[in-house]
């Protein structure tokens, strides 16, 4: 058994390990400033192509996304859908602006395949991936393009918020709180060491040269998870690729760059959380234990965000803090113990569990009534997180109609054939072919840092593969 002094140091150690990141990130978030728009920008709207992968057949939400994107006057929007939806989306494109919107398709719905169908078609210097349920502000493009004045900048994201409905409820508040915390974490970590957990696919801009690189395409279409090919988690892969290839990532946390979106305002939100949790487990485990460069290139982000996937369990931590304080204060006076427990209670439930939402409460003071819901859901989320851990091989969407057919789930994660196997590769698609010949220099794991390869015309050594390259 620990002595009273031992319990005291156990309490102090747990407190520092859990809350050092909160204190430092508060300072970082409060002092963060977005990159300003230059007086004479190198990049403009005509340098931007928007790629919008979707399985929607149309509808007000998709139409609204297209219209708000067009207001920013990009060079082109490429809608990538499945063959069955081409007719409907072509009619929608003609209805909105047939000169600016192009419709492409693949046979089977899968976001990575749809993205790879469109990427070679891009002729502009910047490509922006957009989800089909977002609303862009009019001045988004100047803000999201500003960081690219730095030639080392490979990708840029923006702040995001949920559309606030006329009638609020607890589910909507949880939606809004999730995005608010995400903005807070990303801006804080980027300000310290340039890292962030993931560049969100809702809206993210990239240099087209990165996406059109053959090594990127090979890595993007051959990512694996254990013995399976992984076709989900596309935004996580691109984020890790940028960092592993020495590109910088930026985030424009500014009202004029704020993208609005919708999330499930009901029990389906739990399915969204489960999907995000699985993605976090898979990507953060790869970052820390497979790619590993994060430990020295973004040490703070690794401590503050990545490792919390493994270590941050709210209920056990909070219970241990109160218990260790109880054991450490057994010889204190009653008044001192009451004061210590009161301060700890206020610190945990008054400050640390709400500080990331201060901006939200400032905008909507009435939402303070949902603080108990927010705290309770934080504890419940531990169960979601645990279930995500034990079901990592599942890739169900859970919250979108038509997204979880047996065929779509098969495509998102498929078994790899054994090395040397002559069994036909179940990953093949009639409309999406994986590269059969790959330049030798490209046969690198997606996480290896290497210089961008020279033009393929300069290479004569090729290797023929029958199975995807993977560790």
Curated annotation (Swiss-Prot):
Q: Which family does it belong to?
A: Belongs to the GT2 glycosyltransferase family.
Intrachain disulfide bonds: none
- So what does this one do? Glycosyltransferase involved in the maintenance of the outermost surface of the fungal cell wall. Likely functions in the synthesis of a currently unknown, potentially minor but widespread, extracellular or outer cell wall polysaccharide which plays a key role in facilitating many interactions between plants and fungi by enabling hyphal growth on solid matrices.
Q: What is its EC number?
A: 2.4.1.-
Work out whether the entry's keyword set contains Glycoprotein: yes
Q: Which Gene3D superfamilies match?
A: Spore Coat Polysaccharide Biosynthesis Protein SpsA, Chain A
Q: Which GO terms describe its molecular function?
A: glycosyltransferase activity
GO CC entries: hyphal cell wall; plasma membrane
InterPro entries attached to this UniProt entry:
Glycosyltrans_GT2/GT47, Nucleotide-diphossugar_trans
Q: What happens when the gene is disrupted?
A: Severely impairs hyphal growth with filaments both shorter and growing in a sinusoidal manner. Results in a dramatic loss of disease causing ability on wheat leaves.
Q: Tell me what organism the protein belongs to.
A: Zymoseptoria tritici (strain CBS 115943 / IPO323) (Speckled leaf blotch fungus)
Could you list this entry's UniProt keywords, alphabetically sorted: Cell membrane, Glycoprotein, Glycosyltransferase, Membrane, Transferase, Transmembrane, Transmembrane helix, Virulence
Membrane among keywords: yes
Q: Which residues cross the membrane?
A: 4-24, 305-325, 339-359, 368-388
Biological processes, Gene Ontology terms:
hyphal growth
Q: How does it sit in the membrane?
A: Multi-pass membrane protein
**Sugar-modified residues:** 29, 88, 222, 458
Q: Where is this protein found?
A: Cell membrane
Name of the protein in its database record: Type 2 glycosyltransferase
